Amino acid sequence: MAIVRPVVRATMIVPGALRPAFFRAVPRRTRMSSLPASASRRHVHTRAIRVDAYARDDGLWDLEAALVDTKSRDFPLATGIRKAGEPVHEMRVTLTIDTQLNVVDARARSDATPYPGYCETIAADYRKLIGLNLRQDFRRHVREKLGGTLGCSHLTELTSVLPTAAIQAFAGEVFKTRDAAGDDHHRTQEKPWQLDRCHALRSDGPAVARYYPRWYRAQHKTHKSN
């Protein structure tokens, strides 16, 4: 078995009393305060999503994604009462990928579901993810293979966070992130992978002008003749 080491963790924090065990050890410095509430309110539901990435000693990478839904009150289901704080859904998807973001293995598991004995039977179908590439229409291909009644809506939704989680894991490990004078991009003709992938890092923007001056492209204004 390949040895793995954790590389990156992306976590949504949930309230302490309802926090599933695998969310409780998140360092305090990673916690985000809520935006100001516009009216008085009561907490009803928490959906927590966590992704861990591991670099394996065989050169591959594991992405482990988990989704947990909990309620703040006892919740009646067709199959019985789910107590406050007990997961209504607790599901996991693990992809093994190479450095080209090709999926070489895929596994899914449902540990808590609203309909035990039924929901979890679809897990093996998530092996259909093998052969996909996280940067080549991954979400569309997942919908085609596992959307609607072809899969579990929650497992399928969970896969949607994996492309960007993989890119964050690869940053500084597989993808070079340095800039400024003397960086790797000055020694090669390779454009930094993160440019032109969001509004802040557009090639004609001030952030690129400051941090990636070599790749800055000023926007040329066109003048209409009268």
Question: What do the PLM-derived regions correspond to, one by one?
Answer:
Residues 1-8, 12-14, 26:
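Short hydrophobic transmembrane-like helices used for membrane targeting/insertion
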Residues 34, 69-226:
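Active-site- and interface-proximal helix/loop "cap" or "latch" segments in soluble metabolic
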Residues 14-30:
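Serine-biased, low-complexity intrinsically disordered segments, primarily in secretory-pathway proteins
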Residues 29-32, 56-57, 98-100:
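Secondary-structure boundary elements
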Residues 6, 17-19, 37:
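Generic early N-terminus positional signal peaking at residue ~5-7
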